[in-house]
Amino acid sequence: MAHKFHITPAANEQFKFDFSYNGEKIFWSENYKQKASAKSAIESLKKNAPGAATADLSKDETGSGYRFEIVKSKDDQFFVRFVASNGETMVRTETYKQKASATNAIESLKKNGPGADVADEA
């Protein structure tokens, strides 16, 4: 299987999406009130993720515009969020024990997101 975006139903007649590989979710979104908004967010990721900078917040780095942020959790694990130019988080990952796993998630979306199919399962 290839990398793919999946749009699925969420609570309260809303929609969410994820970016996965072989059925394993790498990134997932918040809920959207309209399916069109979820589709728009996916298109924004496809367009903006490949050239986005990475700010490692665990090293007190900062960033602006479209960017990936590596965040250290309270239990010394790491997760990634992709932030839009307006400062809103678009998607995030699970927490990883190793920062390298967080970096791999970023590289996967940068490399494989633009060409990934979108499966509308909602």
Residue ranges and their predicted role:
Residues 1-12, 47-75:
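N-terminal segment of the canonical double-stranded RNA-binding domain
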Residues 6-8, 16-20, 24-32, 41-45, ...:
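A structural feature that tracks compact, well-ordered secondary-structure segments
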Residues 27-33, 53-60, 90-98, 117-122:
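Short, tandemly repeated low-complexity microdomains enriched for cysteine and small residues
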Residues 35-61, 104-119:
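A low-complexity, Ser/Thr/Gly/Pro-enriched, surface-exposed linker/loop concept
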